[in-house]
Amino acid sequence: MAVAVASGFWIWAAVLLVPAAAVYEDQVGKFDWRQQYVGKIKFASLEFSPGSKKLVVATEKNVIAALNSRTGEILWRHVDKGTAEGAVDAMLVHGQDAITVSNGGRLMRSWETNIGGLNWEITLDTGSFQALGLVGLQESVRYIAVLKKTTLTLHHLSSGHLKWVEHLPESDSILYQMVYSYGSGVVWALGIVPFSHVNIVKFNVEDGEIVQQVRVWTPWLQHLTGACGVVDEAVLVCPDPSSHSLHTLALETEWELRQIPLQSPDLEFGSGFQPQVLPTQPSPVAPSRAQFFLQLSPSHYALLHYHHGAVTLLKNFPQATLVSFATTGEKTVAAVMTCRTEVQKPVSAGDGSVASFPETSGAQDSLACFNQTYTINLYLVETGRRLLDTSISFSLEQKGTRPEQLYIQVFLKKDDSVGYRALVQTQDHLQLFLQQLAGKVVLWSREESLAEVVCLEMVDLPLTGAQAELEGEFGKKAAIQDGLLGMFLKRLSSQLILLQAWTSHLWKMFYDARKPRSQIKNEINIDTLARDEFNLQKMMVTVTASGKLFGIESSSGTILWKQYLPNVKPDSSFKLMVQRTTAHFPHPPQCTLLVKDKETGMSSLFVFNPIFGKWSQVAPPVLKRPILQSLLLPVMDQDYAKVLLLVDDEYKVTAFPATRNVLRQLHELAPSIFFYLVDAEQGRLSGYQLRKDLTTELSWELTIPPEVQRVVKVKGKRSSEHVHSQGRVMGDRSVLYKSLNPNLLAVVTESTDVHHERTFIGIFLIDGVTGRIIHSSVQKKARGPVHLVHSENWVVYQYWNSKARRNELTALELYEGTEQYNATAFSSLDRPQLPQVLQQSYIFPSSISAMEATITERGITSRHLLIGLPSGAILSLPKALLDPRRPEIPTEQSREENLIPYSPDVQVHAERFINYNQTVSRMRGIYTAPSGLESTCLVVAYGLDIYQTRVYPSKQFDVLKDDYDYVLISSVLFGLVFATMITKRLAQVKLLNRAWR
């Protein structure tokens, strides 16, 4: 009974006495920041009015959002599933309603665009989604037409209720791709049999009855979408590059295609290019405009006019980048973006400042604009005449990128002239919102490639000039070269520099104290970057999936530099390595990015300065073979750059840098350099040893049967982590020594059988040097996804228990015992005994999106697990709660060690969330880095959003808190000094008076 009471007491103590990680209201945003993104635009709709303040977008990240057109901030956002089920297939905006179709045509939703509220949601029948259209009747839009592979359905716009559904004739052989209506009481469905004929079915809007069905032969046409368009009053126009002509068909009256040859010699179809008709329909209750664009090649457009069976050329654009239509009131304009060949004073897309680039580009490539300067002009669609004072010129910072999408927001000014704004999206996922304002063309910009961060590193900022001068005093070279007198003079000069810096800092403090807080500018630019006192401010080097690199200042989230890799394919993999830090002044810091193309397996290296974002003058080696593994060795060259080893598919090693000094060191250290390779498809893990001639030798091999289980994750320890304590003091005052094997690999496997009764998760702890299996365990009736953290002497991994239908965490800890085998040096080749492995499992009440452990400079601070939840919260869980040594029944020794009694449930307390309400949508990873304070760990969580903060696993034991009352303690000290002086004087007077007596 007493044991039960004691156990209950300890459980309640563990639950109630939890370390709080909350923040006060005045601390919100002081040490942390969050940046929200929506992703690359897939569909967009801009309001056509002068006072419009929002634009509605649907993105490739399955996000529907509204952006403030004045600032670019997100007004509201809805994040759907990250899989294909949440993909937005189509979006239409009418008035205050945005209609979206997602999940392959399974869900249709209506959104209120002002506040983002859901008006209605309906589930559609199964079938391949093809097209979406608005259907007008009697000068009002009432219905939504949904075209699928076999059916055409009509739904009420106000409620989403089904009006009628009709099966399409011969849908098993005809591929229906287009739907069209213009308020005449009918709706057309257009389908095609490739290289055969086009089938046109006409439905009555009221009852869905088939009014007419027409079949026309088109032996030259393969697709309707991406080729044909409907112009004027229901006239289908299809280009035919083989006959250099256009084919038209009036859907109301004609039964055969009419061929119209293109008479102009300037209208030549591009070789191997599928020409495309780009029409515009300003209103669903009105016919399409008779004017349309014909795209003849990737950069050649022509504005044509259809009238009574004839097509006339209004304007030819042989070198156009993008085109778009826009309508306001009764005016419809065409926007054309072209590359500006002569650049005088373009406006930079970064900050809007005017710069001079007097250059003239040569012959233009079909898609490239070598000077990266573009111009947008408006043209009247009726005549093709360019409108005066409608030109906007802008330039892109990054070379190799180009605009991909153009959306126009046009409106009428007070003098009845046309004004407009433009939304441009580039190849590197940059969104620019442009306006007609001299000096500030770029109203705002958004770097949406940051919604897909793939790897991240934090680099220490460089020292200031005064700090570098002070550091240089203590070098060995300085002592030899300068001598005693020279060092004394250098000390005086450095102290004068520090005094000058301190004086300017005081002056700035007094100057800012006279201003309101809102007017104090703490702008951070790349020229004033310097390491702070506690090294809390760092440079976040971020690599995105689009091939864009960013340098972000960690304390504010300010983007200081960016670079774009133009030839990176979408599915490439990246690995970022810091070869030289800022600690080796005057040598600049150096980062190396390894990019691997998954299709070809070929890789390339990019070397750059992580502080300034400039490409390095050091030429990396050209990689002619696919790279299997890369290793960053602690070996340095004469310029303090770590050596990078690259292993190709022939198991040959390339060193970078490959100087004579490096090759000599590799020749000496080759017997102690080992690495491993993983072939997940074959289930093979191989260990190799480096030879002195930079070839490799197979040292061990382990095969996991791929027909039974597959390798899903292999993770080693972080090379930068420090372990402060070699063991744990037990209750009897003995020491339980940790098994700190730096070569240990944690390998996670998952069964190939998907039946819930036969699934399992396996974990192997393997020595990467010898291939020895240190430990293996199997979790039966479990499946992934598995999240793993491997640090010090412990491993924590999460999985789904399919039998109990819950998420579980399993913790493993490795110990050598009460006697340490070798305290001075570790060797995998000299370990006769296997370590003791302790294991314990816990129930976690939520699934996990990402998991990482905190890290500090010396490893003294207690470790916490940072767990990203699907809700976007980040839980800071003390590692002590996942201690495998937690006893079921507490003993005197366990109480002496402060071990919490074992309880299988891990409670999630809101006060342990380090990001309070700053949730991170669709979190993919958490990155941790040490700071100059042992108590502080820097954390970056990334996914659709980016969130940066600081955590204090053991509280702030090495720095004063923010609420420390300096005035009070100073007053007390001055009061004590003053009281001491008065008391001393009174005591002297008293002694003098006593002496006179």
Swiss-Prot record:
Gene Ontology BP terms: protein insertion into ER membrane by stop-transfer membrane-anchor sequence; tail-anchored membrane protein insertion into ER membrane
Cytoplasmic side: 988-997
Compartment(s) of residence: Endoplasmic reticulum membrane
Keywords, comma-separated and alphabetical: Disulfide bond, Endoplasmic reticulum, Glycoprotein, Membrane, Signal, Transmembrane, Transmembrane helix
Lumenal domain ranges by topology: 24-966
Disulfide bonds: 228-238, 339-369
GO MF entry, a single one: membrane insertase activity
Membrane-topology descriptor: Single-pass type I membrane protein
InterPro entries for this protein: EMC1, EMC1_C, Quinoprotein_ADH-like_sf, WD40/YVTN_repeat-like_dom_sf
Residues with glycosylation annotation: 917
Listed transmembrane segments: 967-987
GO cellular component: EMC complex; endoplasmic reticulum; endoplasmic reticulum membrane; membrane; protein-containing complex
Coiled coil: none
Position of the signal peptide: 1-23
Family per similarity comment: Belongs to the EMC1 family.
Its biological purpose: Part of the endoplasmic reticulum membrane protein complex (EMC) that enables the energy-independent insertion into endoplasmic reticulum membranes of newly synthesized membrane proteins. Preferentially accommodates proteins with transmembrane domains that are weakly hydrophobic or contain destabilizing features such as charged and aromatic residues. Involved in the cotranslational insertion of multi-pass membrane proteins in which stop-transfer membrane-anchor sequences become ER membrane spanning helices.
Record text on subunit structure and interactions: Component of the ER membrane protein complex (EMC).
Stated name of the protein: ER membrane protein complex subunit 1
Organism encoding this protein: Mus musculus (Mouse)
Gene giving rise to this polypeptide: Emc1
